[in-house]
Amino acid sequence: MKKKKPLTRSQNMARIKSKNTKPEIYIRKLLYKMGYRYRVNYSQLPGTPDIFILKYNTAIFVNGCFWHRHENCKIATFPKTHAEYWEKKFRRNVERDIEVREKLFEMDISVITIWEREINKMQRNEKYKEKYLKILKDRIERVFNYEEKDISVQMEIAEESMQ
């Protein structure tokens, strides 16, 4: 891999957004269409959730699989250069995600993580999107007391039960 000049690398990194990303905007539009009203980047809570639905006391994080290390995901690749730096960076991201989740649970706030991979699949597959949004609605409104951190686990269960 060709080594980049510090200025080039800095410019590349500056283009990586942390707020109002395309996946976040996609999820916000879906939630709005479903009738939910929410706060964006709600800084009054630990971890500043991407979306906070006050009525249901629910924090939603829209996580990139690469940066937040989505388990068993092909998007969560590991860079070949500067391995020590990346390993430390990723470990800290995951630790911080766990800490934030625990703090929110202590405050009796429901936490939902929506992964980049799931959003990609929703955009490609209308049937998947419908099922996903149904489970998301149930999670937000706490119809069931889910223990899984991940809606994709419930999607797998739902798909198996339909076969």
Task: Please describe what each predicted stretch is.
Residues M1-T113, R117-Q163:
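Nucleic-acid endo/exonuclease domains
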